[in-house]
Amino acid sequence: LTEYFIDAAQSCPLCFRHVAGGAVCGSCQKKPPAFDRMWASLYYEPPVSSMIRELKHLADLGMSRPLADLMCQNAPGWLATEHFDFVLPMPLSKERRLKRGFNQSEALTDILAKRYGWTLLPRHAVFRRHGEPQSTLKSDERRRNIKNAFKIKAELPKACNILLIDDVFTTGSTLDELAKTLKKSGAGKIFCWSLARPPMKK
C-alpha cells in the first residue's frame, strides 16, 4: 500500500496539505495551529479508508496492528530527533467510548508506544466533553463544536513534550483545540501523528 503514502517533502509540515517543496502553506502562515508539527502517514481513500472503517465502526480490533504497521512504514522523520515525555491518543468522550466499546486511536497508540518505548499519558488525565461527531460537521461547525471540549485533569510536568496520535486528520480543529488546552496547562511542544488524512486539492 506504499502508493497511498503521503509525501512529506511535498506537504505543509503543519497541516499536510499539498505544497510544492514542503513549505508552510498560506493558511498556516496566516493562522498557525497550536501544535508544533503534524504528520499523516496515508491518504484516506480505499482500501485504507475501508480498513479504518472496519476498525472504527465494525470494532475489528485485529485491524489495528496492520494499520499501525502502515504508520510505521511512513513514520515522521522527526521521530528520530524529537523527545516525547508522553504520548496521548485522541480522547473520546465517556459517552462515545461506552457506545463504541473502545477508542480506535488508543488501539493504535498502544501498539506504537510498545514499539517505540513511549510513556502513555493516563487516560483519565484528559476529559473530553460529549458533542456531535466531528465527521458529520462542516469546517466552521467543527470549530464551534470542539471549542473548550477538553479539560486537563492531571498536573503536567512543566514544558513537557507530548505526541498526539489520531486515526484521521481532516481540518485539524480537534487536534488544534487539544494542543491549545495542553499548552494552557503547561505542556511544551505538541506533535501530532495521524494515520490518515483525506486527499487535498493541489
Model-derived features: positions:
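Glycine-rich phosphate/pyrophosphate-handling loop used in enzymes and phosphotransfer proteins
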Residues: L1-K202
